[in-house]
């Protein structure tokens, strides 16, 4: 990155870590809470309402020396699908991927059916994603459909 380009940055560049970009502003603090950022000792930068040609405005989180596991990424996808995850090493983006819901969620979501076996026995919940755009999921065991707004993340 050129010296002139660095002067234009609104948020400091990361040497190593993860930048979560294109977070809808209304979801930024939900994402931060879901990731447990308040418990991390890493350097964290959170910015909201940055100008975005793609979205109008966006949120961003940068976490130094943190690289997320698959289940952490899947948690983010449940509340803010289509965000961009940038993996940074030595100030360079080495991997960039759009976060999408996987086809199946295991142990990440609580079924909101009180009679579901997953709420009455010591077992992991299992959901099939039936509509990635709307964020609709269906319990594997009781077949209850849950809309994105009603998802309870464990």
Swiss-Prot record:
Pfam families: PyrI, PyrI_C. Keywords: Metal-binding, Pyrimidine biosynthesis, Zinc. GO terms for molecular function: metal ion binding. It comes from the Bacteria. Binds 1 zinc ion per subunit. One of its GO terms (biological process) is 'de novo' pyrimidine nucleobase biosynthetic process. SUPFAM superfamilies: Aspartate carbamoyltransferase, Regulatory-chain, C-terminal domain, Aspartate carbamoyltransferase, Regulatory-chain, N-terminal domain. The keyword Zinc applies. GO terms for cellular component: aspartate carbamoyltransferase complex. Its cofactor is Zn(2+). Zn(2+) binds at residues 111, 116, 139, 142. The keyword Zinc applies. Contains catalytic and regulatory chains. HAMAP family: Asp_carb_tr_reg. Belongs to the PyrI family. This is Aspartate carbamoyltransferase regulatory chain. It comes from Parabacteroides distasonis (strain ATCC 8503 / DSM 20701 / CIP 104284 / JCM 5825 / NCTC 11152). The lineage of its organism: Bacteria, Pseudomonadati, Bacteroidota, Bacteroidia, Bacteroidales. The gene is pyrI.
């Amino acid at each position: 990155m050129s010296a002139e380009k660095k002067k234009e940055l609104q948020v400091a560049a990361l040497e190593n870590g993860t930048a979560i970009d294109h977070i809808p502003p209304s979801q930024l603090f939900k994402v931060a809470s879901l990731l447990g950022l308040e418990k991390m000792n890493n350097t964290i930068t959170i910015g909201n309402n940055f100008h975005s040609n793609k979205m109008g405005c966006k949120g961003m989180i940068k976490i130094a020396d943190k690289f997320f596991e698959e289940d952490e990424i899947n948690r983010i996808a449940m509340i803010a699908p289509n965000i961009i995850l940038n993996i940074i090493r030595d100030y360079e983006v080495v991997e960039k991927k759009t976060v999408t819901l996987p086809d199946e969620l295991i142990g990440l979501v609580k079924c909101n059916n009180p009679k579901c076996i997953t709420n009455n026995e010591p077992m992991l919940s299992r959901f099939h994603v039936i509509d990635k755009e709307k964020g609709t999921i269906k319990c594997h065991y009781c077949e209850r459909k849950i809309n994105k707004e009603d998802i309870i993340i464990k």
